[in-house]
Regions:
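A shared catalytic/ligand-binding motif for oxyanion handling
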Residues: 1-192
Length: 192
């Protein structure tokens, strides 16, 4: 998806040979179905961008709930949600309004989505300032439904370093449950 002003736009990348079927897109999401082959159950992946304006964020949550209603299959959603789930996901500057957090939590609950956790860096975004105005926040995350989690023996989300961007790279490592010969798959998503 094309950028809007200084924002980088959305991208979803996968390795050559992966069977990925496009479902839908907008300036705030890209939705695909991933078919691993070898009889593995297809699953859905959605790249998501939550509206940066807190007052407009309910529109983002409505979109996510609409996507949920369109297709009931194993589902993972990842990206910059522009929201946190708890106050410990933000360090510095002004506190978030508790109603904002509740709207995000309610949306994830309505969609049956669970945070996948992470290893490495605690925060995924930095405002680039120093001193008292420096703010670090976990805006980027991966969430999935139970059906998607049941497809894999192991799911690992890593927050990679913020080298060239104000957001960090999210890396997802999966170990399939279905195959006889256990193979490691590695997906990497980067905010563009």
């Amino acid at each position: 998806m094309l950028s809007d002003g200084r924002s980088g736009g959305l991208a979803m990348l996968w390795k050559e040979g992966a069977k990925v079927r496009f479902k839908s897109c907008s300036n705030t999401h890209i939705d695909v179905v991933v078919c691993e082959g070898n009889g593995a159950k297809p699953w859905r992946a959605t790249r998501f961008y939550g509206h940066p304006d807190a007052g407009m964020r309910p529109i983002s949550w409505n979109l996510l709930e609409s996507l949920h209603r369109q297709c009931q299959m194993p589902w993972v959603v990842f990206g910059d949600f522009n929201e946190i789930l708890s106050s410990d996901e933000k360090l510095g500057w002004l506190d978030r309004d508790a109603r904002q957090l509740e709207g995000f939590k309610e949306c994830l609950s309505n969609c049956g989505l669970f945070d996948l956790g992470f290893v490495d860096q605690r925060f995924t975004w930095c405002n680039g300032r120093i001193g008292e105005q420096r703010t670090l926040v976990r805006l980027d995350r991966m969430v999935a439904n139970k059906e998607w989690l049941n497809l894999f023996l192991e799911v690992k989300v890593v927050h990679r370093s913020m080298v060239a961007f104000d957001h960090c790279l999210l890396s997802l490592s999966l170990r399939m449950r279905e195959s006889r010969k256990v193979a490691r798959k590695r997906f990497m998503f980067e905010k563009m």
